[in-house]
UniProtKB/Swiss-Prot annotation:
It catalyses: agmatine(in) + L-arginine(out) = agmatine(out) + L-arginine(in). The gene is adiC. This is Arginine/agmatine antiporter. Residues 1-11, 62-83, 143-144, 205-223, 302-325, 374-384, 428-445 are cytoplasmic. It comes from the Bacteria. It is found in: Cell inner membrane. Agmatine binds at residues 23, 96-97, 101, 205, 293. One of its GO terms (biological process) is amino acid transport. Keywords: Amino-acid transport, Antiport, Cell inner membrane, Cell membrane, Membrane, Transmembrane, Transmembrane helix, Transport. The lineage of its organism: Bacteria, Pseudomonadati, Pseudomonadota, Gammaproteobacteria, Enterobacterales. The chain crosses the membrane at residues 12-24, 42-61, 84-109, 125-142, 145-167, 193-204, 224-243, 277-301, 326-342, 350-373, 385-404, 409-427. L-arginine binds at residues 23, 26, 96, 202, 205, 357. Induction: Maximum induction requires anaerobiosis, acidic conditions and tyrosine.
């Protein structure tokens, strides 16, 4: 029986590519333009961010070796802090997974408008986005092996322009172009680096992907930690080398208004054909990451449903172990949100929802850091000082990211937390038919 289950699971390389693909997603292709508002000094922001992201990846790597349970942050929060925080973590992360997909598919299909101008029509764009979302829902239903293969191909295609610019872009790199825009933010050095962090801190969302998908990974105790750290390192190298090279290729004034920095850099170096290839690869990278995030939405909901913290329908699986009903529900919700974002006013509001959903992932990150301090207590051995330092750095990384968010985004995130509290009480009453034990003794830990 176990061998049949393992046959549907995936190995180290596909999981590592899923992590790096989920991290880079669509954002990497717009990063140079976003960072151009600060200038070349952004390299310092990258160094700070990479230290924080690596610390967070090491937190997840250690947690997955201590507890290889599927569900990632949800499983850790539930084990260490009880069902309430487990429920809260799962709802936040589940929402973030599929809401983020809606923003990502619009960007990915938008790149395809380079080849099919009709996609610039709002109705055609929306219908195409819905079709693409359902393609990835159906691929997930086929099984995790299928979706990780698709994402592996998509990630490799996305890496073509990124690695190409990171390696060969330096032949067109001009030091004077880079240094002429060293700090164009109008702020002092510290302020400029802080403004950079507001962009770069978000660039590593997805570091937890392997631990959430542990239930479909072969030998998770070994492969999940390696895939987590490996995926972050791949993303970090690609980010720094490619964005720095582009900042030395394209003058700052042009880069700040560029809608396709990688495409512009490729056209500058090799002509229009190269620009078209980059647009295709960017679309493949964006759309390919949809598969991984849809898989995570299904797996985190299934893990909670198995524990009774999500409706039982999310735990129903097919022969491949895929939570079919949960994925179909996610598909319906994504379709509704996709159509609701067609009008200009709704699109503006959805932009806020997308930003809030990113903050949703930071709360599970913070809980995972705290969980490592509890679960690792007495198990770190001589490495205890190192893991305390790593956890502290990861804490600071997450908190700094929240501080850099807008006040409106933080407010709505807090409102969501309050709503989840009420939902937890209703869910408790659904599961427990007997009266609440008023005389139950208070546990002394």
């Amino acid at each position: 029986m176990s061998s049949d289950a393992d046959a549907h699971k995936v190995g180290l390389i596909p999981v590592t590519l899923m992590v790096s693909g989920n991290i880079m997603g669509s954002g990497v292709f717009l990063l140079p333009a976003n960072l151009a508002a600060t200038g070349g000094i952004a390299i310092y922001g990258w160094l700070v961010t990479i230290i924080g992201a690596l610390a967070l990846s090491m937190v997840y790597a250690k947690m997955s070796s201590l507890d290889p349970s599927p569900g990632g942050s949800y499983a850790y929060a539930r084990r260490c802090f009880g069902p309430f925080l487990g429920y809260q973590t799962n709802v936040l992360y589940w929402l973030a997974c599929w809401i983020g997909n809606i923003a990502m598919v619009v960007i990915g299909v938008g790149y395809l408008s380079y080849f099919f101008p009709i996609l610039k029509d709002p109705l055609v764009l929306t219908l195409t986005c819905v079709a693409v979302l359902w393609i990835f829902v159906l691929l997930n239903i086929v099984g995790p092996k299928m979706i990780t293969r698709v994402q592996a191909v998509a990630t490799v295609l996305a890496l073509v322009p990124i690695v190409g610019i990171a390696v060969f872009g330096w032949f067109w790199f001009k030091g004077e172009t880079y240094m002429a825009a060293w700090n164009v933010s109008g702020m002092n050095t510290f302020g400029a680096i802080q403004s950079t962090l507001n962009v770069t801190l978000w660039s590593f969302i997805g570091v937890e992907s392997a631990s959430v998908a542990a239930g479909v990974v072969k030998n998770p105790k070994r492969n999940v930690p390696i895939a987590t750290i490996g995926g972050v390192l791949i993303a970090a190298v690609c980010y720094v080398l490619s964005t720095t090279a582009i900042m030395g290729m394209i003058p700052n004034a042009a880069l700040r208004v560029s809608a396709s920095p990688f495409g512009d850099a490729a056209r500058m170096a090799l002509g229009d054909t190269a620009g078209a290839i980059v647009s295709f690869c960017a679309a493949a990278g964006c759309l390919g990451s949809l598969g991984g995030w849809t898989l995570l939405a299904g797996q985190t909901a299934k893990a909670a449903a198995d524990d009774g913290l999500f409706p039982p329908i999310f735990a129903r699986v097919n022969k491949a172990g895929t939570p079919v009903a949960g994925l179909l529900i996610v598909g319906v919700l994504m379709t509704i949100f996709q159509f609701s974002s067609m009008s200009p006013n709704a699109a503006k509001e959805f932009g806020l929802v997308s930003s809030v959903s990113v903050i949703f992932t930071l709360v599970p990150y913070l809980y995972t850091c705290a969980a490592l301090l509890l679960l690792g207590h007495g198990h770190f051995g001589k490495a205890r000082p190192l893991y305390l330092l790593i956890t502290f750095v990861a804490f600071v990384y997450c908190i700094w990211a929240v501080i850099g968010s807008g006040a409106k985004e933080v407010m709505w995130s807090f409102v969501t937390l309050m709503v989840i509290t009420a939902l937890y009480a209703l869910n408790y009453n659904r599961i427990h038919k007997n009266p609440y034990p008023l005389d139950a003794p208070v546990k002394q830990d």
